Structure formats: structure tokens, C-alpha cells
Amino acid sequence: MSKKDPRDMIGYGSKDQKIKWPNNARIAVQIVLNYEEGAENCVLNGDNNSEIFLSEIIGAQPIKGRHINMESLYEYGSRAGFWRLHKLFQEKKIPITVFGVGMALEKNPEVCNAIIEANYEVASHGWRWIDYQNIKKTEEKKHMKLAIQAHTKIFGNRPYGWYTGRCSPNTRDLVMEDGGFLYDSDS
């Protein structure tokens, strides 16, 4: 057998997990709404290119300039998508978690007020919705601090949860160094 793999490829394996949910429920469901609109790659945010990741535009390529169609896709989420889902969750009394990107939240106080009034849990989804894979550790740390500051200013407390989404090799270390989170959804 070769050396131990640093990744856990086994988990709990064939051992049966004895999980007991409240009221003998057989399944637990958590609904998460990602709020990223306005913090994606965009020349208006000082970026060199437009966003291309997770787009409805098949085969999207970065454009060195404004990509009006891409911007419109993201703007839909803040203008209409959030509100449609929010109304549904409120009507059905469904509690949710919002993964909120700091820059995006700062751009839409009305959405933030709705989140506060609904008493949704809000986990920080970073300062920007960008790929941190090749971002310097110092810059990623700065973005983490900006995200925590924005969250604290908007919601009155620092976030309990963290989710970068497109993390770097440094992300987990930075989350641990900060030490103020109860959970890390990138794990």
C-alpha cells in the first residue's frame, strides 16, 4: 500500500450513521440563497474582464469591457429573483440562510432590510464573488476583513458562517486564523 492520501476518501464507509433528527424526521433540508449580484467580475468594479462563471450564456468568454448581457443576468437576481424567492419563503414560512457577498449587499439596502425583517441567517460569502485561486493571501485576507466589516455594519453582528465558494489554497487557513466563525461551508 502506498503512503496515506491527504484527502479523506473513506468517510464513515460501511458503518451505519445513527443520526436522530428532531421529531424523528427522516431528512433535514437547508435552503441557501446566494446573494452575489454586483460583486462579480465587472469592469465597473475595476476588473479587467466581465464575469464568465456560472452563466446562462453557454461558452461565455471574458470581455475586456462591459458585457451588457452578463451584467443583465446578474442584475436580474437583485431586481427580481431575490424578491420572488423572498416572497415565496415568507408565504410558506420557510427559514433560510443567505450567503451574502459584502460588496453586493452594500449595493442593495432594500434587500438587506428584507433579510433583517425576515430574520434570515446570513453567512458571509466574502467581499467579492470572484475566483480566489490565484489571489495573493494578503489580498484575500483584506477581502475577508472587508466582508466581515460590511456584514457587521449592515446586520449589527459579525457573521457566524463563512462560504467563499471559489476558494484558494489559503482560504481555510484564513478562516481558521480569523477564528470567529462557527462553521465554514467550503469544507
Regions found by a protein language model. Give the residues of each.
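Catalytic alpha-helical scaffold of carbohydrate-active enzymes acting on polysaccharides/glycoconjugates
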Residues: S2-S187
